Amino acid sequence: MTFPPLKSLLKFYAVVPTADWVGRMVKAGADTVQLRCKTLHGNELKREIARCVAACQGSRTQLFINDHWREAIEAGAYGVHLGQEDMDTADLAAIAAAGLRLGLSTHSVAELDRALFVHPGYIASGAIFQTTTKQMPTAPQGLDKLREYVEQARGTPVVAIGGIDLNNARAVLATGVSSLAAVRAVTEAANPEAVVKAFQALWDG
C-alpha cells in the first residue's frame, strides 16, 4: 500500500467549511486547502465535494477532503485527511489505489508512530495552542513538543494546527514544520484573502 507523494510543499494550509470558502482560498492563492464539512450528507455532500474539486482545477492549490474518503475518491480529489479514529474504519488500500494523497491527524507520540507506519503524505500535529474550533482529546502541545514531533517524523512533512495565527506563525514555523494550518484565523478574519497572502509570504516572501 503506497500513497502518492505530494506534488509540492503544503506551506499555508487553510481549513474551511464549504465549497464557497474553498473557491475563495484558491483565488487568494492558498497552497493547500481542506474541506472540513460536518453539516452535509448524501448527495448534498457529494455535490459540495465536486464543487471543491472543480474550484481547484487549473490552480496550484492542493485539495484535501476531511473524513469523507469515499466521496473524495468518487470526485477525484487530490487527497484525503483522516483522524486517528477514521484510520480504523477507512479503506486505506482503496484510497491509495485511487491515487489520492493521505494526511493523518496526530496528538501524541503513540499516534505519530501509528500514523507513520502507513507512510502518509503528511501528518498533522496539534493542537499546538488552545483552540475553540473543535474539542481536542489532549492538552495543547506547545512548541517544544512540536519540535520533538518534527524530529520523530523523520522527514515526513508535519503540518502544525490549532490556535495558529499571524501573531505566532513565525515561532511555529521555526520548529521545522513544513506547513501551518489555520481555521479561525481565516474564517473569522475581516479580510480572509489578506490573511492568506500574509501567511503565504512566510514562504514566498
Swiss-Prot record:
Keyword Magnesium attributed: yes
GO biological process: thiamine biosynthetic process; thiamine diphosphate biosynthetic process
Keyword Calcium (UniProt): no
GO cellular component, one term: cytoplasm
Reaction(s) this enzyme catalyzes, per UniProt: 2-[(2R,5Z)-2-carboxy-4-methylthiazol-5(2H)-ylidene]ethyl phosphate + 4-amino-2-methyl-5-(diphosphooxymethyl)pyrimidine + 2 H(+) = thiamine phosphate + CO2 + diphosphate; 2-(2-carboxy-4-methylthiazol-5-yl)ethyl phosphate + 4-amino-2-methyl-5-(diphosphooxymethyl)pyrimidine + 2 H(+) = thiamine phosphate + CO2 + diphosphate; 4-methyl-5-(2-phosphooxyethyl)-thiazole + 4-amino-2-methyl-5-(diphosphooxymethyl)pyrimidine + H(+) = thiamine phosphate + diphosphate
Annotated positions binding Mg(2+): D67, D86
Pathway: Cofactor biosynthesis; thiamine diphosphate biosynthesis; thiamine phosphate from 4-amino-2-methyl-5-diphosphomethylpyrimidine and 4-methyl-5-(2-phosphoethyl)-thiazole: step 1/1
Binding site for 2-[(2R,5Z)-2-carboxy-4-methylthiazol-5(2H)-ylidene]ethyl phosphate: T131, T132, T133, G163
Keywords annotated in UniProt: Magnesium, Metal-binding, Thiamine biosynthesis, Transferase
Free-text cofactor note: Binds 1 Mg(2+) ion per subunit.
Gene3D superfamilies attached to this UniProt entry: Aldolase class I (3.20.20.70)
Protein role: Condenses 4-methyl-5-(beta-hydroxyethyl)thiazole monophosphate (THZ-P) and 2-methyl-4-amino-5-hydroxymethyl pyrimidine pyrophosphate (HMP-PP) to form thiamine monophosphate (TMP).
UniProt record similarity statement: Belongs to the thiamine-phosphate synthase family.
UniProt-listed PANTHER family: THIAMINE-PHOSPHATE PYROPHOSPHORYLASE, THIAMINE-PHOSPHATE SYNTHASE
Protein's name in the database: Thiamine-phosphate synthase
Organism: Neisseria gonorrhoeae (strain ATCC 700825 / FA 1090)
